[in-house]
Design a protein with these regions (language model features):
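Helicase P-loop NTPase motor core
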Residues: 1-71, 96-98
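Active-site-adjacent beta-strand anchor residues
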Residues: 21, 51, 75, 82, ...
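Structured loop/turn residues at secondary-structure junctions
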Residues: 23, 53, 77-78, 213, ...
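An acidic site on a long C-lobe helix of protein kinase domains
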Residues: 27, 31, 85, 155-158, ...
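Well-ordered alpha-helical segments embedded in enzymatic catalytic cores
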Residues: 27-34, 88, 207, 291
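Conserved helicase C-terminal RecA-like lobe
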Residues: 44, 58, 62-64, 90-333
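Short alpha-helix plus adjacent loop in nuclease-associated cores
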Residues: 75-97
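Acidic, low-complexity intrinsically disordered tails
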Residues: 335-341
Length: 341
């Protein structure tokens, strides 16, 4: 009988980095900056990956990657702007920004129970022929905004409810975050009725709410999302051609068996990784620990683990501040600490 001994042929190399950021967006901007730096050093995008515990963890990063013109493919979930429920919420915001947006009107009207294509067409026709004419100076003053939303008593009650909600948040002095908050309150019953996995989708929308907090105007938000008017519930992710270079975004489950030169593991934060639910049993916590091991062993040369130090979790009502228990306490001889300022 022979004794088995495990060893590595690789020697030397740099220490993994543990990077703390003040906010989620600061974490995202740091990762984008490092991706660009590694690319300048000769590491191709296809040799880099960003890994995360849950699909919604990449949403803020996806916006920053889009702004930086970094192409990416996502595995283990839809891209942020390709999910039907996020497109729904953005449609409400698009209408507040541009009341002539027929595609967005059709989208949100058809979400209403009892409203079919014929009713939606009548409402949209009235909007284009009568209301827009009443408020040609829609963006210039609150009085113009009031004119646009006046006199809709002839609409069905469920459509009036939509108009009431939009009227209450149409004023230009209301922030995108506040507008989004009221839209989500209105939309939540629709979400529950339309999707069996509404709890999972609600987390996506909570993340979207957090993202809107840093914007002062809806047009800035829509520009960063780089959205065309949404006309489909789901957009297919195009497969890259043989000459296309792209960054990989992936859930850890989808990254098993794969390796990259450079790997970022984001949201190494108590409540995110491990998740709050995993604390219920030892078995679930061990599964989380195993996933962290899988994530960290995907890197061949460079491993960067990041976490934001102050984020609000809508589901639990907690403010998450502690680094993941899986990395806390690791000595500086094994993990190089960095702070983003």
């Amino acid at each position: 009988m022979y004794t088995k001994e495990l060893f590595t042929k690789k020697s030397g190399g740099t220490l993994p980095q543990l990077v703390s950021a003040q906010t989620e967006n600061q974490q995202s901007r740091y990762v984008v900056q490092k991706i660009l730096e590694y690319r300048e050093m000769g590491v191709p995008l296809e040799e880099m990956a960003v890994l995360f515990r849950s699909s919604f963890h990449s949403f803020d990063l996806e916006i920053e990657l889009t702004k930086a013109n970094i192409p990416f493919l996502k595995f283990g979930g839809f891209k942020f702007i390709e999910t039907a429920h996020v497109k729904d919420v953005i449609a409400y915001l698009r209408i507040l920004e541009n009341p002539r947006d027929v595609i967005s009107w059709n989208r949100i009207l058809l979400l209403i129970d009892g409203v079919g294509p014929r009713t939606a067409e009548k409402v949209v026709d009235d909007i284009l022929k009568r209301r827009v004419g009443l408020a040609k100076e829609f963006k210039e003053a609150v009085t113009a905004t009031t004119k646009f939303w006046m006199d809709y008593g002839n609409y069905p009650d469920n459509v009036c409810k939509l108009f009431n909600m939009l009227k209450d948040i149409a004023a230009p002095n209301i922030s995108p975050a506040e507008k989004t908050f009221h839209i989500l309150q209105y939309y939540e019953p629709i979400l529950r009725a339309r999707y069996e996995d509404h709890l999972k989708r609600k987390k996506d929308l909570d993340t979207f709410q957090n993202i809107t907090e840093r914007y002062k105007a809806i047009d800035e938000l829509l520009t960063d999302l780089a959205l065309e008017p949404p006309n489909e519930s789901i957009v297919d992710i195009e497969s890259p051609g043989p000459e296309t270079e792209y960054l990989t975004l992936s859930t850890i489950h989808s990254a098993k068996g794969l390796e990259w030169n450079t790997v970022f593991v984001i949201y190494a934060l108590e409540g995110r990784f491990p998740t709050l639910r995993s604390a219920a049993t030892d078995e679930e916590m061990e599964e989380e620990r195993r996933l962290m091991y899988v994530a960290c062993t995907r890197a061949k040369e460079h491993l960067i683990i990041t976490y934001p130090m102050n984020i609000y979790d809508h589901e639990s009502g907690l403010i998450l501040t502690k680094p993941s228990r899986f990395i806390e306490g690791i000595g500086e001889n094994l993990l190089e600490p960095w702070v983003v300022e």
